[in-house]
Amino acid sequence: MKIIDNLFSLSLALALILILVIFNVYAADQSICNSGTTVVLHDNGLVKSCQLKDDYDANNIRCKNGGSVSFYSDGKLESCVLSADATVAESKCKADGLISFYIDGKLKSCMKQDN
């Protein structure tokens, strides 16, 4: 029984590591930015902020074309203008409003939908 418990714990740990690797590999490059507008880069070369040329999906958040977007230095979404209504951690966020996240991915703020 102890062997089964150990195998289960090991498989959970491996699954968690795999999930973390998948989410951290995802980082935006300058191709998502509107040409002719200011693109700010982090020291590591990843996009810090720019104006989007097209809608952009980041971890189930759809950011609006023409809107501003910003990323943390590890490539995680910091903020953007929502292209469509979104529900994040039970908060209903309004399209065309700014949404922002903490570096750990938790919702920081958004424009709430009208009830």
Predicted regions and their residues:
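Short linear motifs centered on Gly/Pro in flexible linkers and helix caps
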Residues: 1-2, 25
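Bacterial N-terminal signal peptides that target proteins for export
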Residues: 2-12
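Bacterial N-terminal signal peptides
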Residues: 11-22
